[in-house]
Structure formats: C-alpha cells, structure tokens
UniProtKB/Swiss-Prot annotation:
Additional information: The basic functional RuBisCO is composed of a large chain homodimer in a 'head-to-tail' conformation. In form I RuBisCO this homodimer is arranged in a barrel-like tetramer with the small subunits forming a tetrameric 'cap' on each end of the 'barrel'.
Cross-referenced SUPFAM superfamilies: RuBisCo, C-terminal domain (SSF51649), RuBisCO, large subunit, small (N-terminal) domain (SSF54966)
This enzyme's EC code(s): 4.1.1.39
Name of the protein described by the UniProt record: Ribulose bisphosphate carboxylase large chain
Tagged with keyword Membrane: no
Binding site for substrate: N116, T166, K170, R288, H320, S372
Residues that coordinate or bind Mg(2+): K194, D196, E197
CDD domains hit by this protein: RuBisCO_large_I
Upper classification of the organism: Bacteria, Pseudomonadati, Pseudomonadota, Gammaproteobacteria, Chromatiales
Statement: the UniProt record of this protein carries the keyword Magnesium: yes
Role description: RuBisCO catalyzes two reactions: the carboxylation of D-ribulose 1,5-bisphosphate, the primary event in carbon dioxide fixation, as well as the oxidative fragmentation of the pentose substrate. Both reactions occur simultaneously and in competition at the same active site.
Catalytic site positions: K168, H287
Site (Transition state stabilizer) location in chain: K327
Organism this protein belongs to: Thioalkalivibrio sulfidiphilus (strain HL-EbGR7)
Listed cofactors: Mg(2+)
C-alpha cells in the first residue's frame, strides 16, 4: 500500500468525519447531539464538524495526522435524524473509540464531548441529549460508594420510600437552633434531614458547630424512636483538602451520611469523595445545584439524563431528580427515564422517554432518586406512584411549614406515606384514589388532617420548558 502523503489546506469536515456506512462497535462511546446549524451549513457538514471538534479534528489539515492512526481515533458522525416538530435542528449520532478517554474519568469524557465544540461557530446551538457508555468503560468507574441495597441494610429500612426534609430557612440559623429543627423533624417520623445546598461554613454557622449539634439531635431522636436516623452533612468546601477534613470529622462523630454539590464542587472532587465514602463506610448524598444552567434550555446545553449518568459513574448514593409535581422543572416521561437510568442494571432505548440508546450498567449499584422541591402531603400519592420504593421523598416547607411545628409536619408526612404504601400493596390505584386514601388516614391523624387543610390550594401548574421532543409530534 502506498504511504499517505501530507497535503496542506482546508477540507470540509464531511470528507473525514461523516461516515453513514459505519456500524458502531460495542466498545464505542455513542453520543446523540441536537444540532441547530448556522444558516447555510448543511446537516452532514454540521454533524461532521461536531464529531471533529469533539475528537481529533482541528480547522485545517496538519502534517502530524500522519503520525497516528486517524482513521481509528476520530469521532464518526454515522446517523442523522429529524427532531419531531422542529425543522431548525436535527439529531446527530456520533461514535467515539473508547481509547479516546481516560479510564474512570468522567472529567475527561466531558472535556471532549462538551468542551470547545460548544463554542464552535458552525453551529448556532448544540445540546448533548444522551450518551451510551460502553460496559467496557462503565467497568473502569467506581460508581456509587454503596448503592441502594447496602444503604437499606445500613439504615435498616425496607419496603417503602425514605422520607426526608431540607431544613429551612436555608440560611441564617445558628448551629444550636439548626440542631433543634433537625431533632424535631427526626423524632416526628422522618428518616433523614438535610443541609441545603448552599449551607457550607458561613459566619452565622460554622461547619463544625452544625455537625456537632446535628449529631446530638440524631442520637436523641434515635434513642426516642428506636429507628436509624441520618442528616446529610454538606462537606462541599472551597478546596478538596477542606472537603476531606470535613468528611473525616463527620465520620469521627458517627455521621452515617454526608453530602456534596457535585456540579458546583466539580467532578474530580466528587469522584474522589465517592471513593473516600466507599473506603470509610459513609453514604453520599448528591445535590445537583447549577444543573438548570446546563440542562433547561431545550436546544443548548446538556440534558439532565446525561448529568444523571455521569453522576452514577462518578459516584453518589442519592441524586436529586426533580419531582414532576412540585415547584421545579421536570417532564414526567423524561423524569421516569432518568430515574431508571439511575437505578436499573439495564435500560433499553425508549424514545418515548427520551432515552436514545440502550445502557448496560453491569453490576454497578443503583442510586436512590431524590424527589425534592415544593412538595407536600397532597403530592404523596403521585410521588409514591412515580418514584416507587427506591427513592427519598423530601418535604422541606411541606414539613417545617406545618402549623403545629416540625414534628407534626414530619408525622403528617409519615402517616401519608405509610397509608399510600399500604394502599399500593393492597392493589389500589394510589394516584387515582389518592384523596380518598389520605382522607381515611387523616381521620386517625390530626397532624395529617391539618396538613391537608393547610396545603389543599397549593399547586405548581406552570408548563414544562424542556419538553420531550416526542411530545411535539
């Protein structure tokens, strides 16, 4: 075979990176992008440009291409599809050889897939809709420190969703008053309480004060109720060294679970903390603060299903997923899709839920889906139906806003949850019969009755901004 010769100049991307005849390998990492090209840029060229800029390409031919096997290492745009109901954009499917990515590094994956390519002038908007991580790559990642079953065994809680609460006000409480709020919620019937995502170590409450008062509250509530209790102690910090210092102290005082803001804190920090939690027997709750900056626009950014997959690889035992019924953005079908991607071992392609590829997680443990944001007792039937048992239902204002106080709010939520779980186990349609189920339970629980009266008119009926494209058909 004649040796390839270097020929300087600029070629159209499609000449190298548009390969419609390519059949993806089981070891390829596959990505689906939604591309809105600039006027005058055709689909094949735009798709090839994204494949090039997210893998081996640059704007001109370079002689060093001849020093490696470009045909092996390049990304390949292999399929284009219409976006239902939108003529401006299209789906581009791109295959990347696994050797483009460092083993076990979600940071390296994102640096390629959502790096400079998102500022590329040939596209007006670009969104990463889904990624298929090959099982060969999944096996290089640590994943959740413990997973669903191990957490249930550690906390001795089975057969129902867990109940939680974010302490409010989220900022401004002293350590002692914060601990008191935690105690009231836990003794009332909750399994967990939680630091809000922006509680770190501010002047009004330094982290060590909070940790000490919270653990005092946990021990007291456990002694009174005979149940295991926990509080998500947020160890997110300005530096990794400080983060580990806080995590070590939490372990020292007996905390069963800590918390990290995985997007603002960074994927490197999150993976390191997940490894530490695995080695030290501490559960890890993950908050998704900043996700909507990346995932809310329907044409530009990163879809949350990708952020959820990245978190499962990076490591976390819980992840906030939205509620569908609460105050935060969330399409029902899409939410059900990424809940499955967090918990199941194998998730097949399902366009009705926005899942573009089969995803095999092998033996990687699952992640608890956390429903939080503007929910109260009236939402309980829908939440139990949507999220199932392997979830944490967190009622912040829906606990602390009870007219009789935190303990009464917690008690109301526990009674509502157990009534819905019992009805479901009896074969009833919990979502359809929710009002009847809750009303019957409230006859024996004045706390639930008052909660139902307090929040009977509270609804969040704004339309979802980021709808599934299938819904536009």
């Amino acid at each position: 075979m004649a040796a390839k010769k270097y020929s300087a100049g600029v070629k159209e991307y499609r000449q190298t990176y548009w390969t419609p005849e390519y059949v993806p390998l089981d070891t390829d990492l596959l990505a689906c992008f939604k591309i809105t090209p600039q006027p005058g840029v055709d689909r094949e060229e735009a798709a090839a440009a994204v494949a090039a800029e997210s893998s081996t390409g640059t704007w001109t031919t370079v002689w060093t291409d001849l020093l490696t096997d470009m045909d092996y290492y390049k990304g390949r745009a292999y399929r284009i599809e219409d976006v239902p109901g939108d003529d401006e954009c299209f789906y581009a499917f791109i295959a990347y050889p696994i050797d483009l990515f460092e083993e076990g590094s979600v940071v390296n994956v994102f640096t390629s897939l959502v790096g400079n390519v998102f500022g590329f002038k040939a596209v007006r908007a670009l969104r990463l809709e889904d990624v298929r991580f090959p099982i060969a790559y999944v096996k290089t990642c640590g994943g959740p420190p413990h997973g669903i079953q191990v957490e249930r065994d550690m906390m001795n809680k089975y057969g129902r969703p867990m109940l939680g609460c974010t302490i409010k006000p989220k900022l401004g409480l002293s350590g002692k008053n914060y601990g008191r709020a935690v105690y009231e919620c836990l003794r009332g019937g909750l399994d967990f309480t939680k630091d809000d995502e922006n509680i770190n170590s501010q002047p009004f409450m330094r982290w060590r004060q909070r940790f000490d008062f919270v653990m005092e509250a946990i021990h007291k509530a456990e002694a009174e109720t005979g149940e295991r209790k926990g509080h998500y102690l947020n160890v997110t910090a300005p530096t990794p060294e400080e983060m580990y210092k806080r995590a070590e102290y939490a372990k020292e005082i007996g905390a069963p679970i800590i918390m990290h803001d995985y997007i603002t804190g960074g994927f490197t920090a999150n993976t390191g903390l997940a490894n530490w939690c695995r080695d030290n027997g501490v559960l890890l709750h993950i908050h998704r603060a900043m996700h909507a900056v990346l995932d809310r626009h329907p044409k530009h950014g990163i879809h949350f299903r990708v952020l959820a997959k990245i978190l499962r690889l990076s490591g976390g035992d819980h992840l906030h997923t939205g509620t569908v019924v609460g105050k935060l953005e969330g399409d029902r079908a899409a939410t059900l899709g990424w809940i499955d991607l967090l918990r199941e071992q194998f998730v097949p392609e399902d366009r009705s839920r926005g899942i573009m590829f089969d995803q095999d997680w092998g033996s990687m443990p699952g992640v608890f889906a956390v429903a939080s944001g503007g929910i109260h007792v009236w939402h309980m039937p829908a939440l139990v139906t949507i999220f199932g048992d392997d979830s944490v239902l967190q009622f912040g204002g829906g606990t602390l806003g009870h007219p009789w106080g935190n303990a009464a709010g917690a008690h109301a939520n526990r009674v509502a949850l157990e009534a819905c779980v019992q009805a479901r186990n009896e074969g009833r349609d919990v979502e359809r019969e929710g009002k009847e189920i809750l009303t019957a339970a409230a006859a024996h629980s004045p706390e639930l009755k008052i909660a139902m009266e307090t929040w009977k008119e509270i609804k969040f009926e704004f339309d979802t901004v980021d709808k599934l494209d299938v819904a536009h058909k």
